Swiss-Prot record:
Belongs to the class-II pyridoxal-phosphate-dependent aminotransferase family. NCBIfam families: gly_Cac_T_rel, PRK06939.1. GO terms for molecular function: pyridoxal phosphate binding; transferase activity. This is Putative pyridoxal phosphate-dependent acyltransferase. Substrate binds at residues 136, 358. One of its GO terms (biological process) is biosynthetic process. CDD domains: KBL_like (cd06454). Pfam families: Aminotran_1_2 (PF00155).
Amino acid sequence: MSSKTLAKFLEENLEDLKSKGLYNVIDPLESSNGPIITIGGKEYINLSSNNYLGLATDSRLQEAAIGAIHKYGVGAGAVRTINGTLDLHIKLEETIAKFKHTEAAIAYQSGFNCNMAAISAVMDKNDAILSDELNHASIIDGSRLSKAKIIVYKHSDMEDLRQKAIAAKESGLYNKLMVITDGVFSMDGDVAKLPEIVEIAEELDLMTYVDDAHGSGVLGKGAGTVKHFGLSDKVDFQIGTLSKAIGVIGGYVAGKQNLIDWLKVRSRPFLFSTAVTPADAAACMRSIEILMESTELHDRLWENGRYLKQGLKELGFNIGESETPITPCIIGDEVLTQEFSKRLNEEGVYAKSIVFPTVAKGTGRVRNMPTAAHTKEMLDEAIRKYEKVGKEMGII
């Protein structure tokens, strides 16, 4: 007999979400996640993917994955610390370290796992974390898991960070202090003020932790936000995902050799989860090699990002202050935003709405993610549909 308490909880809360329009319906794809996708037998121009460089469908990665399956099988067979570490994992980590300009790196099964692993391996209840108010959910959860005191500072407000860091330092309550920020903030596409953050950190002896999920492959000629600012030797923790620009799955922490050595013996997702599959490891390594060999995909991504931004801006849409190819189209009202996204969908443009509580009330937006794989013809068609729907709904 199943729990009546659970049944009541689920029924009431699911109904509440649905009545408020906050229940997320998942659309399964019947195609690869490229610039054109198929859902329910209909083709859409895809502006919702994190596949920034189009590498998720690249034949070179497919060949690497197939080769690894033939050699190693489909699974690693154990956790890394028993006998699940393949020579392929070591090569991947060496490639990541070279890519990120650090001494060493450690690979995890997901980007989310990285933040659950690294923060709690170093911070505890006697420490404090200074965290940007718009940091990713995995940073928030990883910080909570560590049991450290979490001190939130206003988004990219360096004076607020400085004052709160000074207060934490002078209180004498904490053994260690860490400042954590996203490299690129995914909702607005703005970039963290890393030079100022590093300056404050050096002044007050804060550990520096940058989650570059949306910066790797995009900034710094592909090497990420830290490299973009020339701070590779100044940031203690460089976190990244292998599922966005890299196009596969997994995540990593890059930094000093002694940090990586510590994470290998103290980060629980590394110790208690089976290793990344051979196919994924091989595909990730090939993807990073492609990025280090050429900036062609990186340059095309930025060209397409500028093209879409210009087209939407000229139509009169509010695209915010994005500093990256991420292009939010800010509508404001939550209901209007969701209806706008629905109408775009009907016109063959797949661009999902993002509303409260993911973003602040009154700042609902449709977030567009142009990729290196989009053609100008695809973007022109999307811009035409934006114009049609925007005028029909009185948004422009």
